[in-house]
Amino acid sequence: MKNINLNRKEKRTERHKKVLRKFRKIDNDLPRLRITKTNQHIFAQLLDDNKNIVIASSSSVQLKLANGNIENSKKVGEDIAKKAISKKIKAINFDCGGSKYHGRVSALADAARKTGLKF
């Protein structure tokens, strides 16, 4: 059982490394929306890779939501999009951190798109 989990973790880190390589090849100044999910919560950060700073962040913990299920992921997506738009950011690069674009991750991304962000 330990080897199965280790392989899953290795696969996720390899997927994330592949995504980061693609971002390095793209030479644009768009901020990156980084999604991190745990078993209970979901986190979103807007990162500026040129200056190495966090522009805005939101999470199910910060919004005092009970967990990071799909409904609460939508609320986090709306919140991060509102914060980005208030800082005059309309377009971003999406980084799901090696997680599959499914379930909570896609719900957060769709809510951010509906609120006004362009990926």
Curated annotation (Swiss-Prot):
Keywords: Ribonucleoprotein, Ribosomal protein, RNA-binding, rRNA-binding. One of its GO terms (biological process) is translation. Transmembrane segments: none annotated. The keyword RNA-binding applies. This is one of the proteins that bind and probably mediate the attachment of the 5S RNA into the large ribosomal subunit, where it forms part of the central protuberance. Part of the 50S ribosomal subunit; part of the 5S rRNA/L5/L18/L25 subcomplex. Contacts the 5S and 23S rRNAs. This is Large ribosomal subunit protein uL18. It comes from Malacoplasma penetrans (strain HF-2) (Mycoplasma penetrans). The gene is rplR.
